[in-house]
Amino acid sequence: MDNKLRIDYLSNHIDYKVVQHKDMYHFNTDTCLLGEFINIKKNDTVLDVGTHNGALLVYIIKKGWIATGIEINAKALEICKLTLKENNINATLIDGDFTSYNFKSKFDCIVSNPPYFTFKDKQTNKNENKNIARHENSLTIESLCKALKQNLKENGVIYLIYKANRINELEKELNNNSLYINELQYVYSKVKPNPKSVLVKASFNNNGKIMQDNKYI
């Protein structure tokens, strides 16, 4: 194996392996929280948007769901292939842009840990691979929500993790595309008073109620 590659394990799952490249974006706590948050029927079709090194795909496939991953960064997709091989699992992988790709069919579930830093939030990294994963240069909140609407089945569900202080922006864009938040889980660090991230479940179902909970890590 390339000396810039290493194998890590997803939290609480010693059999969930992820290949990571020294110079590319690594999975983090958000990835693990989202993987555990997803709850759908066995054999549902799931699309992982921005699949990167395949960490979320491992959760999805190991739980018995039929997975497709789309990734705009070809280098990251090659790492994802190695992750699948290490776990002896299979998925359909697409080298493409979620906002413009023409899928053959819609999905029961779409999941994503999208880039949620704007260029105003934080100085961008000189590493272009990390910029693609972290900053809204190729996948804005507006384009994400529009594509979610286009590719989700009528009774489908969306699972996301997003920056907590941008939840109002996310909700607005979801609503603009006839999508509605059904559940929120704010993620708190035990040493900080304000939540950093929020887990989001959304769908076309607008029942006027949002289940809300807090998670402490």
Task: List where the protein language model places each region.
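Conserved SAM/SAH cofactor-binding pocket of Class I
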Residues: E36-F103, C109-Q123
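Flexible, glycine-/basic-rich loop-and-beta segments that form/coincide
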Residues: V191-I217
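S-adenosyl-L-methionine
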Residues: D2-K41
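Short glycine/threonine-rich catalytic loop with a Thr-x-Gly-x-Asp
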Residues: Y25-F27, H52-N53, K192-P193
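SAM-dependent transferase fold signal centered on methyltransferase-like domains
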Residues: L33, K62-K63, E78, T83-N87, ...
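Residue-level signal for inorganic ion chemistry
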Residues: L34, N113, L144, A202
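Mobile active-site "lid"/loop adjacent to the S-adenosyl-L-methionine
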Residues: P114-S143
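Conserved Class I SAM-dependent methyltransferase catalytic core
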Residues: K17, S138-P195
